[in-house]
Swiss-Prot record:
Keyword Secreted: yes
This protein's record includes keyword Cytoplasm: no
Disulfide bonds: none
Name of the protein: Hemolytic protein B9
Top-rank lineage group of the source organism: Eukaryota
Subcellular location: Secreted
GO biological process: defense response; killing of cells of another organism
UniProt note on tissues of expression: Expressed by the skin glands.
Function: Shows hemolytic activity.
Annotated GO CC locations: extracellular region
Keyword field: Amidation, Amphibian defense peptide, Cytolysis, Hemolysis, Secreted
Residues carrying Phenylalanine amide: F13
């Protein structure tokens, strides 16, 4: 799980 994706998910959700 890439930190970039985690950041995007954190922004959306």
């Amino acid at each position: 799980f890439l930190p970039l994706i985690a950041g995007l998910l954190g922004k959306l959700f």
